């Protein structure tokens, strides 16, 4: 929403009437998702105990629903394993920007890919761009959203599991109690809930992220378990900061001396009100790099 001469100007999105036949045959210039390669060994994740524990819990939860072995969801709820009536559909990870939510989901997917491969099961992750969904007209936006779920269902088989990663889901699904809610957002909400309710958790799981938990619609929280991404400790932020500093030091300063300067920056930024996060650690290290190594004040 923008302010202009004291007036509220709300973006109006044109509404188009799309028939069911047109919806089924609609083709987009590009899909609103990217299929992430979970087989890659390399990762940009800096391993610290707090996040490692969080990722481990996520992997265990996903494996419980996706596995077909003993003590799995299918074992405990054999009569419901092929049903879409089970109320749990996935997670919403909350936390400040830069708290590692998206990276944690991708890393959990990578580890699950390796673990379930031993059961002959393939795991894939569709990384959904909410911006690509929102850029259409009303009618088109709903169909873009449906295309995500259609893709997930197109590969449903006994040896395939799908993770749907919705980044910043609050930008896609606005709470119906929010005064800024428009007809297009209400329609998107309805489409999302309808599609989610048709998912079988043993085949497809949603992992969403948000920096604004208070903006989530209650219906989202009733379907997706809300989990807080734990903030890194001060020492863990120093570990992350160290990875952004020259290994051999520079300009007469060792890496450890640069790290101490980065630690001071971290504390200064914390005192200014910035929440503890991996982003804060990297930002503080880059500030030191630019000043002490590059020479740009």
Roles of regions detected by a PLM:
Residues 225-244:
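Conserved AAA+ ATPase "SRH/arginine-finger" region at the nucleotide-binding site
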Residues 122-157:
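Short glycine-rich substrate-engagement loop in P-loop NTPases that contacts/grips substrate
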Residues 82-83, 87-126, 151-155:
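Walker A/P-loop
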Residues 130-142, 172-186:
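Flexible beta-alpha connector loops of hexameric P-loop NTPases
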Residues 1-6, 14, 34, 249-297:
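Conserved AAA+ ATPase small/helical "lid" subdomain
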Residues 36-89:
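Pre-Walker A (pre-P-loop) alpha-helix and adjacent loop at the N terminus of AAA/AAA+ ATPase modules
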Residues 149-156, 185-203:
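Substrate-engagement module of ASCE P-loop NTPases
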Residues 212-225:
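Short regulatory helix/loop adjacent to the ATP-binding pocket of P-loop NTPases
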């Amino acid at each position: 929403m923008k302010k202009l001469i004291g007036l509220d100007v709300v973006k109006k999105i044109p509404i188009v009437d799309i028939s069911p036949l047109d919806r089924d045959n609609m083709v987009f210039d590009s899909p609103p998702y990217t299929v992430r390669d979970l087989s890659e060994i390399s990762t940009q994740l800096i391993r610290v105990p707090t996040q490692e524990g969080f990722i481990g819990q996520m992997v265990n939860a996903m494996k419980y629903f996706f596995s077909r072995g003993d003590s799995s969801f299918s074992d405990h709820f054999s009569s419901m394993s092929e049903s879409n009536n089970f109320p749990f559909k996935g997670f919403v990870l909350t936390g400040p920007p830069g708290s590692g939510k998206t990276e944690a989901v991708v890393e959990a997917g990578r580890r699950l890919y390796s673990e379930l491969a031993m059961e002959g099961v393939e795991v894939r992750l569709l990384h959904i761009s909410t911006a690509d969904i929102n850029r259409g007209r009303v009618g088109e936006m709903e169909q873009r959203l449906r295309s995500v779920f259609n893709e997930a269902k197109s590969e449903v088989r006994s040896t395939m599991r799908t993770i749907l990663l919705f980044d910043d889901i609050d930008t896609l699904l606005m709470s119906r109690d929010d005064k800024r809610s428009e007809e297009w957002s209400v329609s998107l909400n309805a489409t999302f809930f309808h599609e989610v309710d048709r998912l079988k958790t043993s085949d497809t799981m949603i992992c969403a992220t948000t920096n604004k938990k208070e903006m989530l619609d209650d219906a989202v929280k009733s379907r997706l378990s809300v989990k807080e991404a734990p903030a890194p400790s001060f020492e863990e932020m120093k570990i992350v900061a160290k990875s952004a500093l020259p290994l051999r030091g520079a300009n007469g300063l060792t890496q450890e001396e640069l790290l101490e300067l980065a630690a001071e920056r971290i504390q200064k930024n914390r005192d200014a009100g910035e929440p503890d996060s991996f982003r804060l650690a990297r930002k503080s290290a880059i500030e030191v790099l630019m000043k002490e190594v590059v020479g740009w004040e």
